[in-house]
Amino acid sequence: MTLEEKIGQKLMLSFRSGWTMRDGTKISSVQTINDEIHEIIGEYDIGSVILFAANFNSDAKVNVELTDGLQKAAMDKDLGKNSIPLLIATDQEGGIVYRLTGGTALPGNMALGASGNTENAVKAGNIIGSELNAVGVNVNFAPDADVNNNPNNPVIGLRSFSSNPQLAAKFVSAYIEGVQSNNVATAAKHFPGHGNVATDSHTGLPSVPATKEELYKTELVPFQAAIDAGTDMVMTAHIQFPNIVTEEIYSDKKDELISKEKVVRIWD
């Protein structure tokens, strides 16, 4: 691959409401692929696309037509040189983070964790995975592997399985099993831990004063379980950890926990 092709493969694009086409036309919602999207994906060898709620339709057939069109664009040999199938992703955690219109409304992670039965997480993951697979989505940015150890956290809360690292770890593993049984990849998030914050990282930059040793005892426990369970990716958090150097965690766990090749970073 050329450098340009490698860059394209590392990019994950979103086509959402408010998107402006090259001719100045504004699109209110992108639920069908158009010629311009086809050209962008094919010409620049784009590797991934993320879909949000605005991209999904209550009619599953419309969703399938969208994902099928995206894949055809990626495989268009008249535009791109590689013709590599796309990763098509979404955030379908269950509970309050729910993108797939028409999908099954499931209890959130906190409710699953409170049940004490990891089989509930397997079943939830299986339902989510089967529905994503049915509409052509092959990556689920889930499970949320954060430990809910700050009651003032404005963005995680119900999305976490538990404030207990060991319990959260068991449910993270179970959820991964369910999703992956449907040939859908998982991405445990938000590494190295988004639970102990009091600021929403979508609107500010949280700072976590934990030391590396403290992270290994608490926040990293569910992520270790996720890796052991075979998660396909890990999504990083956009959070400050002033008492550690993130590279140390990558270095310490290069083979055991996480490799940079499987890290997903999100810019919105």
Tell where the protein language model's regions lie, with residue ranges.
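Short, acidic/polar
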Residues: 22-42, 121-131, 215-222
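A substrate-binding/cap region within the structured catalytic cores of diverse enzymes
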Residues: 85, 113-137, 142-166, 172, ...
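N-terminal hydrophobic targeting/anchoring segments and the immediately downstream early-domain regions
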Residues: 1-99
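A cross-family glycoside hydrolase active-site/sugar-binding cleft signature
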Residues: 14, 50-52, 89-91, 142-143, ...
